[in-house]
UniProtKB/Swiss-Prot annotation:
Family matches, as PANTHER family: DNA-DIRECTED RNA POLYMERASE I SUBUNIT 2
Domain of life: Bacteria
Keyword hit for S-adenosyl-L-methionine: no
PROSITE patterns: RNA_POL_BETA
Name of the molecule in the record: DNA-directed RNA polymerase subunit beta
Length: 1391
């Protein structure tokens, strides 16, 4: 119970604030990195850091291998792929974001062109020439460390797609197709790429096949087209398939022999006899007595019902039994009956035996009749299909298939053969993929290596056989929604498919070009046009449905976005067609996909989130870890299993009771097996969950007391945490779940130390760490640049703050700087606020939230939002636009914030309508009016030929300028402002260079000093005589820079010193080269869109306080809108006079069933009061220094012995005070999902904090001073401010744009639109009888064009009468009617 949740409780931040955990189940399995899904997939695709010779055939390597070699049509040239390499990216991530570039590396592919000499007569070829050359194939986007891509300057995420796994699936129509409600079974073979193959029963119980959902054919047509035994025997004997004169298909006899066993009837003197098969006779009632054919004795009387046992008994007595002629009638022949002498066919395979046919065969003297074993367990489906199939040979079948696939084209045997080969048996056109082959082997019970990726004859036959078995009631259909049948396509695989398409387009062009150029003189790069491949990549990242603008509202939303699984997208489902089953939770989701986190609305269940411990295996199936259990004893061994592997397991819950040795203690254990819950004995359990939170996703695992919330509200809670806006001062939750640190670390919002070392320098914008190696020697310098007030995709503010001080020791993996929404290395989406559950004058009706003025005043929920505005100066036909301060007809007051270049200063406070960047655009020459002529004569030229197109701040935005960036085209002179920005940037780079060089130099000199100490000098250095023993005093007399010139007599030491010098000089040269490269990039000028000469980006920081209309929420789906800000003195207050911060409506709890919020309130109340007690002890300790023991014993009491001994006991005074200060606001606790604090723990904490265990207190009304009638639940609850801010939504319009057709005002804030006055509003005005108001609403205030003008004129003349005309929408209606051929005339009648 006293475990700490953070794995890194001893880490740098973990020691500063310790989270007490209520978990009873420890973490056995480390949680995988949360964004590994993305990173691992793309690394496997690029194999960037793998030597070209060692690359596995996956990803990019596999794409090139599958498309190359490319041969020309004449067979004289071949282009082969050797290998590829990715060079260094041109710009780093930061530069790409600033310049609007794509973070990508140039892809160089080494290609080999082989040219042959072909002998005209013999056709033999000899190699004439081989040319190898690296060819540039476009840029390949790289993934950042955080699993995102920078495309055109914005961060994007490629969402993984869930799709149906390739393989074979059996299903039925659930009785919906046919009116009788009988099940029609179907099988479908789905390849990774290529044609789909469907087998289905129709209502007449015949089996049909469809290729690519085309017209159906009898299945036997497909079987005829497959190779028969004659051809297979010829190939088996070593004949090349190409050399066979003709390929023989399967015959009717072969088809029937595959699907049916035979029953041979023999003629005896006593009549026809058959072998007695107990299976065939089981369960039937005999119509006549059974007589042994050999002895003639009766073995069973007529009317007997044969059971399995009696049938077996009879089988022991009689081998063959006599049957009447009636038993032969209606049976089907299994083989062709042929007269061996004459070759005459008496009966064909599959033919039905009728009375006449049987008599004819008897007269011909046939003594043995092989028939098909069709009985009540095996139906005649294939035989019946054979009977209705009009084809009987392979050629007919192929031509039939050709007609279905290419209707309207005349078939020839050759084209039909080629089409059929290409459909399922050609590697280039049909690919099951290794996954598909593995799935197919498992389902069909065949054993083909996973390199066989096309269909085989055996696969098709087995599929049809299993389909017929299903029809006969053997076996079960597949569950399409089982995660064993759905797989994940991550970034790497999606990218691989896209790149393959690009290369295939390129391949065609290469073939044609090889034919049209002189193959002897060209080089590989002359043949290649990489545009199609580059375009495919660009299109995928830029406009694919799965390439999404990253949700960067806060660190949790980033992590969740990268872990998202979508069933939509290319090759997936569509919202409209997805049924209920696909969206529903499935038993196999356990531990793989979160059952809670999914959007509300049309996408529910189609977009999911990976569970916390889930991983995706190499086949794309989601796996979850299980602990192994042997003989009822739980081991610490664990392994990851997919849904298919889990099918065999008996899995116990993570909280199954066990003793200290790990033995399960209950007599019966609750387990999951094949999707059901059962009770079994401990020795039958095979495995066990690793953690209670493995079932839910990251966002759901952040909700404390999730087990006490209704699922619908938990869904809202996990979704709303992703919308929490980063606050100026965030608090980590008092009541957390222990997942907070993992999310903060893996999200990339914080800065994590790459190597161990000592902090050397620090300021607000960077941290310099002197990295130390294994032996403690300096290994180099790590400079961490902090992101300061940068804009996220959602306009929230990204700002990082250092957590370390100079001299601090950090180890690899420590969090050294907090980012947005993190505090001390833990996720901090909101604030802990004191909250009371009670009604307050109707202000918290219907989920409204009442807040105290303190919250607004103290910036508790204040957030900073950064808006980006950009303006471009283009080269127009009339001349260049210019960015300038000299704008016509604008007063000095409006230009007060602009510098001499016309760009706003950083730090300026700006309001709506203020000019941010002055810009003028040339105006076309138009004839001048006399007034203009006069003005021009007086004021000179400038004013008239340009117009003001400055960038102004849009309405509703007020803020401070935090950053300005100026981009100039190459070759265009930079203005003063651009030069100033460039100088500042170069200074910053130079400072980094100097610091890094300084640290390297210090380390070098220290090691040099160690080498020199105690050795006699060898002379040749001014000021040190030969033979002088070198000591600190000797060195102190000389400047440090000169030490490197001192030489000593010991040759080994001299060699060491020379090596040191070389290493140091190389390191310094590398630092300088890096600096010069960056400066060169800065001064070079920017790549701007065509026609743009200059671009300016202005960033405005807007401070948003909490105000009425803003949306807030807790973590339990308890959301509401702020209704009123109440003065502090009017808020209800506690007995000690503390006013509460928030008042929530208690009626929001019972019907919503999210009781977790109440438990959180109680526990938060206890935490805060414990923190207060610790704060008092710290004060005493500071005053008189005597209270250390009391403080330690208090901490021991709170955290328990284990944590105390592990972490707290060996702290020094400073560390102890820092810890206690961090606990002053409350002792943070972790109550993990499904394994958290019990009610008894909460009561325990409350009593320890000296509070009433009911969690309720007497509150006093702040307005009357009277205590409320009964006690009120008060406590600390974690509240978030959501990204639905009233300032972004409020909007007003007087006049503005109108729609062209209807002439009605546009809608929406972005269009500066009006509010629709809808039909219900019209009814309201009608009900009031407000006729004139109604008339205005429907005419002059909306779409009566002439009326609008008249109103304007009347207002200008200061009159108040006007006339309403005909609304434009009425004219539109008339035009619509006229377009239908109805002539509508308006009659002008006076009233």
């Amino acid at each position: 119970m006293n475990a700490i949740t953070q794995r890194d409780s001893k880490s740098f931040t973990g020691r500063k604030r310790i989270r007490k955990s209520f978990a009873r189940i420890g973490d056995v399995v480390p949680m995988p990195n949360l964004i590994d899904v993305q990173r691992a997939s793309y690394e496997a695709f690029l194999q960037m850091n793998v030597h070209p010779d060692n690359r596995t055939p996956t990803g990019l390597q596999e794409v090139f291998r599958s498309v190359f070699p490319i041969d020309d049509f004449a067979g004289r040239g071949r282009l082969e792929f050797v290998n590829y390499e990715l060079e260094e990216p041109k710009y780093d991530v930061e530069e790409c974001i600033q310049r609007g570039m794509t973070f990508a590396a140039p892809l160089k592919v080494i290609l080999r062109l082989i040219v042959w000499d072909v002998d005209e007569d013999t056709g033999s070829r000899s190699i004439r020439d081989i040319k190898e050359q690296p060819v540039y194939m476009g840029d390949m986007p790289l993934m950042t460390d955080n699993g995102t891509f920078i495309i055109n300057g914005t961060e994007r995420v490629i969402v993984s797609q869930m799709h149906r796994s390739p393989g074979v699936f059996f299903d039925h129509d659930k009785g919906k197709t046919h009116s009788s409600g009988k099940f029609l079974f179907a099988a479908r073979v789905i390849p990774y790429r290529g044609s789909w193959l469907d087998f289905e029963f129709d209502s007449k119980d015949l089996v049909y096949v469809r290729i690519d959902r085309r017209r159906k054919l009898p299945v036997t047509t497909l079987l005829y087209a497959l190779e028969g035994q004659r051809t297979e025997a010829a190939i088996a004997s070593g004949t090349d398939p190409q050399d066979l004169p003709e390929i023989h298909g399967m015959t009717a006899e072969e088809i029937l022999s595959y699907f049916y066993t035979q029953v041979v009837f023999t003629s005896t003197p006593k009549g026809w006899a058959r072998p007695f098969d107990p299976e065939a006779f089981r369960g039937i009632t005999l119509a006549e007595a059974l007589i042994d054919a050999d002895t003639g004795t009766v073995v069973a009387e007529a009317g007997t019902k044969l059971t399995a046992r009696s049938a077996r008994k009879i089988a022991e007595q009689a081998k063959t039994v006599l049957v009447g002629r009636a038993d032969l009638l209606g049976r089907y022949m299994a083989e062709d009956l042929v007269n061996d002498q004459t070759g005459e066919i008496y009966a064909e395979a599959g033919e039905e035996l009728t009375e006449a046919r049987l008599a004819a065969l008897e007269t011909l003297g046939v003594t043995s009749l092989p028939t098909l074993a069709v009985d009540q367990t095996t139906g005649p489906w294939i035989r019946n299909t054979l009977a209705i199939d009009k084809n009987s040979t392979r050629d007919d079948a192929l031509i039939d298939i050709y007609r279905v696939m290419r209707p309207g084209e005349p078939p020839t045997p050759e084209t039909a053969e080629a089409l059929f080969r290409g459909l399922f048996f050609d590697m280039d056109r049909y690919d099951l993929s290794s996954v598909g082959r593995v799935k197919m082997n498992m389902r069909l019970g065949v054993d083909a290596p996973d390199t066989v990726r096309t269909l085989r004859k055996e696969d098709i036959l087995r599929t049809v056989k299993i389909l017929c078995d299903l029809k006969d009631g053997r076996g079960a259909i597949d569950d399409i929604d089982n995660l064993g049948n759905r797989r994940v396509r991550s970034v790497g695989e999606l990218m691989e498919n896209q790149y393959r398409l690009g290369l295939l387009r390129m391949e065609r062009a290469i073939r044609e070009r090889m034919g049209s150029v002189d193959i002897d003189t060209v080089m590989p790069h002359d043949l290649i046009n990489a545009k199609p491949a580059a375009a495919a990549v660009r299109e995928f990242f830029g406009s694919s449905q799965l390439s999404q603008f990253m949700d960067q509202t806060n660190p949790l939303s980033e992590v969740t976005h990268k872990r998202r699984l979508s069933a939509l997208g290319p090759g997936g489902l569509t919202r409209e067609r997805a049924g209920f089953e696909v969206r529903d939770v499935h038993p196999t989701h356990y531990g793989r996909i979160c059952p809670i986190e999914t959007p509300e609305g049309p996408n529910i269940g189609l977009i999911n989130s990976l569970a916390t411990y889930a991983k995706v295996n190499k086949y794309g199936f989601i796996e979850t870890p299980y602990r192994m259990v042997e003989d009822g004893k739980v081991s610490d061994q664990w392994r990851y299993l997919s849904a298919m592997e889990e099918d065999r397991l008996v899995v116990a819950q993570a909280d199954a009771p066990r003793d200290s040795t790990g033995k399960l203690t209950e007599e019966l254990i609750s387990v999951r097996r094949q999707g059901d819950f059962r009770l079994v004995k401990p020795e039958d359990v095979t495995s066990m969950d690793v953690s209670p939170k493995q079932l839910v996703s990251v966002a759901a695992a952040l909700i404390p007391f999730l087990e006490n919330d209704d699922a619908n509200r938990a869904l809202m809670g996990s979704n709303m945490q992703r919308q929490a806006v980063p606050l100026i001062r965030a608090d980590a939750p008092l009541v957390g779940t222990g997942m907070e640190a993992a999310v903060a670390r893996d999200s990339g919002a914080t800065i994590v130390a790459r190597r161990a070392g000592v902090v050397d320098q620090i300021d607000g914008a960077r941290i310099v760490v002197r990295a130390s190696g294994e032996d403690g020697a300096t290994q180099g310098v790590d400079i961490y640049r902090l992101r300061k007030f940068m804009r996220s995709n959602q306009s929230t503010c990204i700002n990082q703050r250092p957590l370390v001080k100079v001299g601090d020791h950090v180890i690899s993996g420590d969090i050294i700087a907090d980012g947005p929404s993190t505090e001390l290395g833990e996720l901090a989406l909101g604030r802990n606020v004191l909250c009371a559950f009670m009604p307050w004058n109707g202000y918290n009706f219907e989920d409204s939230i009442l807040i105290s003025e303190r919250i607004a005043r103290d910036d508790v929920f204040t957030s900073i939002h950064i808006e980006e505005f950009e303006v471009m100066a283009r080269d127009t036909k009339l001349g260049q636009e210019e960015i300038t301060r000299d704008i016509p007809n604008v007063g000095e007051e409006a230009l007060r914030n602009l510098d001499e270049a016309g760009i706003v200063y950083i730090g300026a406070e700006v309001n709506p309508g203020d000019i941010l960047v002055g810009k003028v655009t040339p105006k076309g020459e138009s004839p001048m009016t006399p007034e203009e002529k006069l003005l021009r004569a007086i004021f000179g030229e400038k004013a008239s030929d340009v117009r003001d197109t400055s960038l102004k701040l849009p309405p509703g935005t007020t803020g401070t300028i935090v950053d300005v960036r100026v981009f100039s085209r190459r070759g265009v002179d930079k203005d003063e402002r651009a030069m100033a920005i460039e100088r500042a940037e170069i200074e910053r780079l130079a400072k980094d260079r100097d610091d890094e060089r300084g640290i390297q130099e210090r380390a070098f000199l220290n090691r040099l000093r160690e080498k020199l100490m105690g050795h006699p000098a060898s002379g040749g250095f001014k000021g040190i005589k030969a033979g002088t023993i070198i000591t600190d005093e000797v060195l102190a007399e000389h400047p440090r820079g000169a030490w490197r010139n001192i030489s000593v007599q010991d040759d080994a030491v001299v060699a060491d010193i020379e090596l040191l010098k070389r290493e140091f000089d190389a390191a310094v040269a590398k630092i300088q080269a890096r600096f010069e490269g960056k400066v060169e990039k800065l001064q070079r000028g920017d790549e701007l869109p065509p026609g743009v000469m200059k671009m300016v980006k202005v960033f405005v920081a807007v401070k948003r306080k909490l105000q009425p209309g803003d949306k807030m929420a807790g973590r339990h789906g308890n959301k509401g809108v702020v209704s009123r800000v109440v003065p502090v003195e009017d808020m209800p207050f506690l007995e000690d006079g503390t006013p509460v911060d928030l008042v929530l409506n208690p009626l929001g709890v019972p019907s919503r069933m999210n009781v977790g919020q109440i438990l959180e309130t109680h526990l938060g109340w206890a935490c805060a009061n414990l923190g207060r007690q610790i704060g008092e002890l710290v004060e005493d300790y500071r005053r008189n220094g005597q209270q250390r023991d009391e403080l330690l014993s208090r901490l021991r009491e709170i955290y328990g012995e284990n944590v105390y001994n592990d972490v707290i006991a060996d702290m020094n005074n400073d560390q102890l005070i820092e810890l206690a200060e961090n606990l002053r606001k409350g002792v943070p606790i972790a109550t993990p999902v499904f394994d958290g604090a019990r009610p008894s723990d909460i009561e325990n904490m409350l009593s320890r904090a000296g509070l009433d265990t009911s969690g309720q207190v007497v509150l006093t009304d702040g307005r009357t001073g009277e205590p409320f009638e009964r006690k009120v639940t008060v406590g600390y609850i974690y509240m978030l401010k959501l990204h639905h801010l009233v300032d972004d939504k409020i909007h007003a319009r007087s006049i503005g744009p109108y729609s062209l057709v209807t002439q009605q005002p546009l809608g929406g804030k972005a269009q500066f639109g009006g509010q629709r006055f809808g039909e219900m509003e019209v009814w309201a005005l009608e009900a009031y009888g407000a006729a004139y108001t109604l008339q205005e609403m429907l005419t002059v205030k909306s779409d009566d064009v002439s009326g609008r003008t008249k109103v304007y004129e009347a207002i200008v003349r200061d009159q108040d009468s006007f006339e309403a005309g005909i609304p434009e929408s009425f004219n539109v209606l008339m035009k619509e009617l006229k377009s239908l051929g109805l002539n509508v005339d308006l009659e002008n009648r006076s009233a």
